[in-house]
Amino acid sequence: MKEMYENAEDKVNNSTGKWSCVEERICHLQHENPCIEQQLDDVHQKEDHKEIVTNIQRGFIESGKKDLMLEEKNKKLMNECDHLKESLFQYEREKAERVVVVRQLQQEAADSLKKLTMLESPLEGISHYHINLDETQVPKKKLFQVESQFDDLMVEKEAVSSKCVNLAKENQVFQQKLLSMKKVQQECEKLEEDKKMLEEEILNLKTHMENSMVELSKLQEYKSELDERAMQAVEKLEEIHLQEQAQYKKQLEQLNKDIIQLH
């Protein structure tokens, strides 16, 4: 009888010890619960990171479109600038040609005036010779030659004067064109500045896109890590849950057996 009592008491003590182990295990699980909840929160945050990645990808597409637009605008400005440079070169060449023509006409005018001056004295003498023709006996042939030369010089002088007038008009037109070309040159310089600004903006966009690509790569890597950690956390939770279920079931069966034996 005493032996049966001692056996029953041992079984009760064993059951009490098993219950203590169960309570200790439950307490341990309660301590692990915050860590598991954090892992679950990471799983929920995964969707937020997906949205961030989507927004960044959308930003890449918009940046690419803007980059193409800036490149098209840059090409257009470069074509306009080349056209203006070609026009400016053409006007500069015409200016140089006109300068040569002006110098030639000025030289011709100077030569004509020089010849006219040289003939002024003989012409004065010619008038005197007309009055005293019989006394001086100047040959009529020489007089005719001098008068013919004088007429030729007058015609040449009129031609040079007409050329000078026309040249002055052309020079005025050219000055107006030159003024217009200065404005064109200023516009060309402004286009060059716009081109430089566009090139800087394109460079900044490319740098931004490169940095964004690095950031996207990091986000994708972080997303993969989160996915893996979330999967591991879920698997661990399922494994712990199955182990706890099996252990609890085993302990419950053992406890039922012990209670039956006590009775």
Swiss-Prot record:
Gene name as annotated: ANKRD20A12P
UniProt keyword Coiled coil present: yes
Originating species: Homo sapiens (Human)
Ranges in a coiled coil: 65-121, 171-263
Disulfide pattern: none
Any matching Pfam family: CCDC144C
Entry keyword set: Coiled coil
InterPro entries for the chain: Ankyrin_repeat_domain (IPR050657), CC144C-like_CC_dom (IPR039497)
Highest taxon of source: Eukaryota
UniProt protein name: Putative ankyrin repeat domain-containing protein 20A12 pseudogene
